[in-house]
Amino acid sequence: MGACLAIFLARRGEEVVLFDAAHAPLTGASRWNEGKIHLGYLYANDQSLSTAAHLVTGGLAFAPLMEELTGRPLKKIAPGDDLYLIHARSVVPPDQAGAYFARVSQLVRERAGGARYLKDCADARAYALSAAELGAVAGEAIVAGFRVPERSLCTVTLADQLVDALAAESRIVHRMGTLVREVAAIDGDEGAWRVHGEAFDYVVNALWHGRLAVDATAGLAPPPGWSHRYRVSAFIRTTHDIVAPSAVVAVGPFGDFKAYDARTFYASWYSAGLLADSGDVAPPSPPTLSGVAKRDIAQRIASELGAHLPIVREVFAATESVAIEGGYVFAQGHGALDDPAATLHRRDRFGVRRKGRYISIDTGKYSTAPWLAHAVAQEIAR
């Protein structure tokens, strides 16, 4: 979010200072995630369709906005549609999931911009897998499957492109290795704000980790019911080509698998990768993982996810390199994903909050970042 907004503002003639506690931009969850460009299919336990309706606009706008930001075509886009594999312990039964997927497909068809998505989804449809199709890809605990027109891309590759785009903008000053703990209005909320002793016409808080604590210093109280989860996953490069589908084990605390191309993969299992879950305003520092701990996580992902999607075992067996990486994810929701009543099953409470010229952005999902950044840039640089 911060990188996207900085580039949009600089190209509108604004002088921008970009603060980051890390040594370089885009080193956390914005680099290390599955890269799903959401259309809303994942949130089948939100039968109101509110989450899908809030996500779909940003998802459809993602590709053209990102290509505008980087000046390059997007790379390493998963070549196949996502498979949603319904687990026997899913919090949403197969018939209900199928009906939900059909409603989301209709929503996508009704929105403008379907042809601009990672693939043309202007005529979006969800298809139930036959028994033979399901048996060819899934393990015994999977009771149904659906093919939906949702895609993912390799976020590591895109992060590198965004870093290059940031470096090319002369109006952006980089303050790396600088932790922002507080902000202060200088002469009322509608005037300048101070950060690290400097005055700025606008201050935008685009943090994932620590945003609420900084908001509090601005006098912006957090809405109730949030969570900070620190999650890691496996980012895999294989020694040779493997043809594999991208799939999500749904709906609950399971896992997913992305095939960006024939040698670049992502794999996760929720309980293996969830290393912290905090409802504090300031969550704990990210855990430091030893090499042994990372190997254990990789082995558990391979075992748990591989039991439901056997091709995963073949991918792990052919590993040339594997990185266990991730970051903090903020959600305006909480609870256990195996609880149908958990508010974490809804992700429609994200967006922009303001106090004068202090702006706080809850990005919501990776896929909605450029859309929100573009809107905020238009507001600031009119």
Walk through the language-model features, giving the residues of each.
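N-terminal Rossmann-fold NAD(P) dinucleotide-binding loop
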Residues: G2-A3
